């Protein structure tokens, strides 16, 4: 059962299944790919991560997805929307892990843009956050390219490891447009003012 669907020009996205453990190896179990997230996961950690992702589909209606290169069908990235607890606040986050050999060609930006589009148009989210590890300049560039603004430095737990991160946030652009439209005087009001 597909809980939610992302779309973009170069990638096909699909939810993970219990049968996808082997497809996660070039992503989560790769030292190069996971270097900014504290290193490769073990088999057991990868299995736990997959189980947590499957649980999130059921309980949150969203979670990580596999991004497949359209021409080749090769896994290019993991991305998706998850809910994270930040203090007393529950925030929707956009996440992306790009295979190391595919970095620098816009895969991360395309994945995050697809996540944001879904969050704002289908989930009607007010805002989306991303937690970028402080040493991950490529991740920060991707967030900023997707109009996310760095807002604060936080300690964030990812893959069982706490790391210093920058929280980046983007507000739903549709809400800003709606607020502007509500604040503009109507034509009737304009004509009575003159």
Predicted regions and their residues:
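Short amphipathic alpha-helical/adjacent loop interface patches that line ligand
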Residues: 50
């Amino acid at each position: 059962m597909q809980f939610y669907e992302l779309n973009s020009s170069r990638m096909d996205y699909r939810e993970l299944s219990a049968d996808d453990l082997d497809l996660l190896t070039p992503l989560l179990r790769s030292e190069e790919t996971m270097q900014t997230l504290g290193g490769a996961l073990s088999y057991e950690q990868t299995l736990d991560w997959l189980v947590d992702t499957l649980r999130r589909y059921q309980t949150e209606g969203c979670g990580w997805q596999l991004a497949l290169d359209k021409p080749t069908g090769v896994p290019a990235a993991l991305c998706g929307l998850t809910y994270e607890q930040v203090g007393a606040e529950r925030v929707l986050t956009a996440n992306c892990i790009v295979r190391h050999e595919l970095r620098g060609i816009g895969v991360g930006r395309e994945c995050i843009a697809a996540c944001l589009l879904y969050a704002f148009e289908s989930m009607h989210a007010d805002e989306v956050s991303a937690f970028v590890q402080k040493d991950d300049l490529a991740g920060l560039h991707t967030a900023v390219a997707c109009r996310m603004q760095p807002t604060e430095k936080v300690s964030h737990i990812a893959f069982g490891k706490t790391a210093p991160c920058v929280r980046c946030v983007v507000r739903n652009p549709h809400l800003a447009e709606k607020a502007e439209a509500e604040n503009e005087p109507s034509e009737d009001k304009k004509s009575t003012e003159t």
